[in-house]
Amino acid sequence: MKKLTVLGVGSAGCRITAKLREMPGAGNLHLLGFDCDAEALKNSGLPEEDQILAGVKWRQGHGCGGRVNEGKTAAAAERENLSRILADAGLLVVIAGLGRGFGSGAMSVIQSVTSKLQLPTVFLLTTPFIFEGPSRSRTAEQTITADLLPLAGAVVTVPNDLLLCSLGPDVDHEEAFALADRVMAQSAMALALTLCSGNRLAADYDTLCALLGRRHAVCSIGHASVAADESEKERVLVEKLLDSPIMGGSSKLKQADAVFMILNGGEALSLGDARAVFENARKYISPECEVLIGAGADPSWGKEMQFVVLTVKFDRNGSETASTEESLPAAGRKGRKRRSSLDDEFQPDLFSSQTSDLGVMEGTPPVIIDGVNLDIPTFIRKNIPVGR
């Protein structure tokens, strides 16, 4: 099995990535943490040599206080460093919690770097709890739709609010975050091992990208494990899966447009085991649903079997994200080579093309003439590149 890299971004991403160190199969992973907050990196539990401190000359090890633009600028300062570190990676899994400064701000930078390296990348992201407020939800949504979907191959977003369906009303918020971290770590491990192992049932990166299709989707993830010698293990695995904290119950399977089922186990894992588990799970899945399966065996799993299911529900209000070429104005395409954020080393991270970024005009009454918001700088509204 080839090694792959897992990059935890921001405090949540680093915490989740650190939990992978204790799981079976961790020896096949290169685990890294990326943040501008030195204390958060230190507290993540990742070894110091696997910590990437962003924008240290500017931030001096301090966090960006939830400010996305500052997080983006700090991350952009590490472009060359990231390119060097990721140059030999075979596949990258990026883990982050969206909604705040560095986790959201760094996404466009990472996407730019990995695209230039032609590095297959899966973004595994969580969106904020409802009690974190609408501002963080808007930030997360903006990051997904503007920074990732137009260019990223595989974007998996899981709402933390799914936890609220399985936790009692008196649950402590720290407990909720800890549980979300643990389940996301288990899911990231299963996804990584399946995409990079010598699978007994094939499921690769290109297939996952085709499944997601750069469309806006809400995902849920279920996780379950049993001893390989347990009686009726196929039935028990599926029952445990449906009770998983961020699965959302059997209704998520029934309503899904696409489902990715992953079974991992020790060397004794057989095709018969995989068939029995998948057939039991399919009882809860709509016949019209597109299903992708993967099964892999690794000695590090011993006598344990792990079953992970990713459900995908596409946003019916949107459509497939237009290609970068199609999204540019005609004037921006005619007579010259197309420029995208991938062609710029630093500029896009300072001048975001998101129309809602009003800078100092945020919160003031807009000046709108003929349907055009004149508070937004002309070069942003018209996608005019600014010379470096």
Language-model features, listed with the residues they occupy:
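Tubulin/FtsZ superfamily GTPase core signature
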Residues: 1-388
